[in-house]
Amino acid sequence: MKVIKTLSIINFFIFVTFNIKNESKYSNTFINNAYNMSIRRSMAESKPPTGTGASGSAGSGAGASGSAGSGDGAVASARNGANPGADAEGSSSTPATTTTTTTTTTTTTTNDAEASTSTSSENPNHNNAETNPKGKGEVQKSNQANKETQNNSNVQQDSQTKSNVPPTQDADTKSPTAQPEQAENSAPTAEQTESPELQSAPENKGTGQHGHMHGSRNNHPQNTSDSQKECTDGNKENCGAVTSLLSNSSNIASINKFVVLISAKLVLSFAIFI
């Protein structure tokens, strides 16, 4: 009799411990699955967009290249604006050589003033010398006037070329004071070219840092908030999946408890009657 009682008690404890282990396993697995599903949904909804900083930097680079192009255009316009003056001077002096004979004068608006003045001054003079042998003195005077205009235009071109040509090594060695002046003149241009990049850089950096900090701080709290919003906003499907798993685990736990109570009653009844 005592042996049966002890065996029944041992079986009861074994059964209880087995049911408790099974209950803990089922409950843990269901809870973990529900938590993982909620985390995956919240992560899928809170993916931050990428590729914002790159476009800003590209825009700043395009602005720098546009400013460089405008500088070249200004130099070209300055050169073209200075040379037509010499062409106008050369062409204004040519009508003095025209006589009663009809001569065609062609004026070309090129950058070289020598070609325009030579073509417009030499050809009419030869025609005048052949057709008017009597007026040689006038032709000589006109030739002298044309030579003076050519010399003036050549001097202007030389001055322009000297101003445009960079200083050679001999000039640098002879005048050491020219180098610091050139460095000072080049410094403000470098500052001007760097200024648009500096103006556009802090905005891009600020937005990039703000986006990264915002994403890193709000990843974890958004998980819980999104899982709560799914149930509160009326998304019954998402909320139902989580609650169904939890309800299944609770039902299994209640069934295990009921089985344990029944087995305990049976063991006690056998022990009492025996």
From Swiss-Prot:
One of its GO terms (biological process) is cell adhesion. Residues 44-200 are annotated as: Polymorphic region. Coiled coil: none annotated. InterPro entries: MSA2. Sequence repeats lie at residues 53-62, 63-72. Glycans are attached at residues 22, 36, 151, 223, 248. Keywords: Cell membrane, Disulfide bond, Glycoprotein, GPI-anchor, Lipoprotein, Malaria, Membrane, Merozoite, Repeat, Signal. A lipid is attached at residue 248 (GPI-anchor amidated asparagine). It holds the Pfam family MSA_2. Residues 91-121 have a biased composition (Low complexity). This is Merozoite surface protein 2.
